From Swiss-Prot:
The record marks 174 as: Important for enzyme activity. PANTHER family: UBIQUITIN CARBOXYL-TERMINAL HYDROLASE, UBIQUITIN CARBOXYL-TERMINAL HYDROLASE ISOZYME L5. GO terms for molecular function: cysteine-type deubiquitinase activity; deNEDDylase activity; metal-dependent deubiquitinase activity. Residues 2-220 form the UCH catalytic domain. It catalyses: Thiol-dependent hydrolysis of ester, thioester, amide, peptide and isopeptide bonds formed by the C-terminal Gly of ubiquitin (a 76-residue protein attached to proteins as an intracellular targeting signal). Residues 261-290 form the ULD domain. PROSITE patterns: UCH_DOMAIN, ULD. Component of the 26S proteasome. Interacts with rpn10. SUPFAM superfamilies: Cysteine proteinases (SSF54001). GO terms for biological process: cytoplasm protein quality control by the ubiquitin-proteasome system; protein deneddylation; protein deubiquitination. This is Ubiquitin carboxyl-terminal hydrolase 2.
């Protein structure tokens, strides 16, 4: 079974890592690439960067750090469409001293730690549980094609990479590169400034009209962080937690809609619209009839 494309969305990525067993970590959108915006997040573990891949532009700015591969998790991307989950794991598995990875990822890290990057990538691709969690967030598509073809210059290919701080070094972890890319020394306190500088330099290589970038922060769960904050009153904590709870409910609903295939409903509704030439007064009854007919045809 192949890996499917999943949407670059904070709710998708947060549910994905929770389904893999990770505790008290969330992924959130970064709407502005500046130091103040980054510092609003509690305990940042890394940043996921999505961009339109271009072989002419995407050349490493830092230094290939081959010596680091014995001490950090770095996997080559050998499986199509796995780069989203691979970017997430590139951050999570390199912060296992700070993050509760859960059984699945802890066992995967232990199993793969002595493997070279190519075999780490193969091990990830062959992990049925990780692949199933990843694929569970694919949009429902009734017209699935098993055809596999190489991308052409006309195709728009998007790619995920990770930025993270490991042992006071700022790394770029890209499964399409030969090794981790070292961007120089960086303490935890310097992470925001370093991240802004490195990512802005990369974006500057693109055409000024190119705006198809997406940034997400992997950080400590905001609700868990709020519960331990002593600078907030109980009322302030309750209000902030309510906002986080509402956000999670919205994410859950959106993920449910992503998984659902509405084609059958639309087909049945279209049939009735054409057949009956309904007017506004019969819309609701026609809609309910279409729903019922669609439901009766669904497989158990």
């Amino acid at each position: 079974m192949s890996w499917t494309t999943i949407e670059s969305d904070a709710g998708v990525f947060t549910d994905l890592i929770e389904n893999l067993g990770v505790k008290d970590v969330e992924v959130d959108e970064l709407y502005s690439l500046d130091v103040d915006s980054l510092r609003q997040f509690p305990d940042i573990y890394g940043i996921i960067f999505l961009f339109k891949w271009n072989s002419k532009v995407d050349k490493p700015d830092g230094t290939m750090d081959y010596d680091s591969m014995d001490n950090i998790f770095f996997a080559k991307q050998v499986i199509n469409n796995a780069c989203a989950t691979q970017a997430l794991l590139s951050v999570l598995l390199n912060h296992s001293d700070e993050i509760d990875l859960g059984t699945t990822l802890s066992e995967f890290k232990d199993f793969s730690k002595t493997l070279p990057p190519e075999l780490k990538g193969e091990a990830l691709g062959n992990s049925e549980h990780i692949r199933c969690c990843h694929n569970s967030f694919a949009r429902s598509d009734p017209f699935i094609s098993e055809e596999v073809r190489a991308a052409t210059d006309e195709d728009e290919v998007y790619h995920f990479i990770a930025y993270t701080n490991i042992n006071n070094v700022f790394y770029e972890l890209d499964g399409l590169q030969a090794a981790p890319i070292n961007h120089g020394s960086c303490t935890k306190e310097e992470f925001a400034e370093k991240a802004v500088s490195v990512i802005q330099a990369r974006i500057a290589n693109y055409d000024p009209a190119e705006i198809r970038f997406n940034l997400m922060v992997i950080c400590k769960d905001k609700k868990a962080s709020l519960l331990t904050r002593e600078d907030l009153t109980d009322e302030e904590k309750a209000a902030s937690i309510a906002v986080e709870d509402e956000k999670r409910l919205r994410w859950k609903r959106e993920n449910q809609l992503r998984r659902h295939n509405f084609v059958g409903l639309f087909v049945e509704l279209s049939k009735l619209l054409v057949k009956d030439r309904i007017d506004k007064n019969t819309w609701n009854s026609t809609l309910e009839t279409a729903k019922a007919k669609y439901a009766s045809q669904k497989r158990p």
